[in-house]
Amino acid sequence: MSRSNSRAKSSAKPAMSAADSVDVPVVGMREPCPCGSGRRYKACHGKSASTVFVGPARPFEGMASECDIVAMREVVPAASAPLTLTGANAGRVVTLVTVLPMAWPALVRADGEIMLALQTNVGSGDASRDLADALVSALDAEPGEPVPLGRVTAESPRLQDLVDVDTPLDITVHADFEFWVDGAEEITDDVRASLDRAGSFAHPTVKLASVPSAYWTQMGEKEHLRWVMPQDEETLLNALARLHAAEQDTLGEGTRFVVMFRAQGVVCPVWDLPLGTGAEAIEEPAQAFGTRLAEALLDESPLTDAQRRARAGLTTRQVTLR
């Protein structure tokens, strides 16, 4: 056999099956693919569904509460906030929540209120468009029904296209997930089981009042402060390096700057706190740190040797949340 024939045969594409040509619903990556192939969705149609397009680095950029939305999606277990819709759907009651039963993207309650979830099992790679897609579907869904995630493309609307982006969110942090069923006379066994499972992960969390987008939490025998910041990553790293080199990056005695989460295009520094500190006691130190950080962000002078070493150390503490 000649090389040219070998190449031709190896590059030939198999004929498209009937399953390839149908519109396959989006399901969890580990679930059986709805096309009937017998494979998991991740290894079948989920492959193309997850690589339809590359989303923006900061999907929630331009929203007044970008950092809080990222916090609700990545580090806050149970929280909710009313959304203000614009255009033809202005006035419709929509609540943004961290997560819904069985990780549904959205749910229309019996009274018509839409609950829109940030934490789901599937996604296109653009969290803003995923939310917008679920919201559009929910606007036409019947009350009492969960809403699945549809096909999202680069032409799909963003959440910013459907809601008021200039009004900061009024976020309520919950101790559990009972807000899922507030006012509901009856709930299914599946929802109750999901509520109980989720409740076991609802670590005590408090949103600080003294600084924006900062959340105290206790996880077992540890307390942390997680603070989502809007600054450009490189600029923020330089400022934090200046503070670290000057030993000004802590929140008081016994506290320690430990890691930086990277998520949805922004950075979330994390501090360890002594057990028993509590949220109230960290309000003033966090505010003081915010003042020091603001000053460091204004400093555009070249980093010193000590600051460059500090910056190198900080980069090793970065963890990307996906």
Model-derived regions: residue spans:
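Internal, hydrophobic cores of structured domains that mediate oligomerization or house catalytic pockets
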Residues: A110-E223
